[in-house]
């Protein structure tokens, strides 16, 4: 890895960032990728509520906090490692390290302390299975994905997506002490959802990824191949997302959201495949990117309403 205090050159010019004397609290918080932390808390919570167990609210709250901190720690380590390429991309150039607000060594120390602390506290407050799964998630994202896969293969998002899919598994383990079929199904849904979600964005940002040297699918296999793969993943996702209904922990509300959302994903994927030039292409890709977020949110919200709030009953119960 090149020194983060050196100037970074790109084909279009030179970007540099200097070591900061110390960042503000808000800068350190930004290192944690707070938007990702919110999603992690949400999916981990759903992993907890679908479990057939009595949940201790105090342990659940501490566990959610530690899972979120662990996710933030891995995000911090990711930003530390990726600061050189972040400086080359418009959407990431203003992150705390490339913008010079936080020194790389500060970010590294911050990420390590939070990683170790979150795992230890989760183990002591809940159980060591959950702590081990959290540790694996952190290492997988910060080391295997960030330091290896991201810059090595166009399948980076596919394989690396496992890290983003693990929070429901960690959540279930935290409140039950084991990993059940419910959280594994949620893992599979997020895992298959991830490629079409990120590849839609990659179609629009392919130039920036190429400039930063990241082998995203549109730059390696080409836009047309990427569009076809988005359709294939969406075709797999639609029936996969209905598994909770057949397994008895998804009710009629979830079924309706799953069917309509799955059809929406397929329709968006077809639009991305059809519209291949200019502004219509960009709108179709960004439309699918935005809809995929809404789809996953509504899907998991339906489970939360049914299982967590007890508003509905599972159709297969």
Swiss-Prot record:
The topology of this chain with respect to the membrane is: Multi-pass membrane protein
What chemistry does it catalyse, as a reaction equation?
Answer: heme b + (2E,6E)-farnesyl diphosphate + H2O = Fe(II)-heme o + diphosphate
Asked whether the UniProt record includes ATP-binding among its keywords, one would answer no
Identify the pathway: Porphyrin-containing compound metabolism; heme O biosynthesis; heme O from protoheme: step 1/1
The regions listed as transmembrane in this protein's record are: 36-56, 57-77, 108-128, 129-149, 157-177, 184-204, 230-247, 251-273, 284-304
Q: Which GO terms describe its cellular component?
A: plasma membrane
| Residue stretches in coiled coil | none
Q: What else is known?
A: Carbon 2 of the heme B porphyrin ring is defined according to the Fischer nomenclature.
Instruction: Tell me the protein family, please.
Output: Belongs to the UbiA prenyltransferase family. Protoheme IX farnesyltransferase subfamily.
The record's HAMAP family line, in alphabetical order, gives: CyoE_CtaB (MF_00154)
- Purpose of the protein: Converts heme B (protoheme IX) to heme O by substitution of the vinyl group on carbon 2 of heme B porphyrin ring with a hydroxyethyl farnesyl side group.
The protein, known as: Protoheme IX farnesyltransferase
Species of the source: Methylorubrum extorquens (strain CM4 / NCIMB 13688)
* Lineage, uppermost ranks: Bacteria, Pseudomonadati, Pseudomonadota, Alphaproteobacteria, Hyphomicrobiales
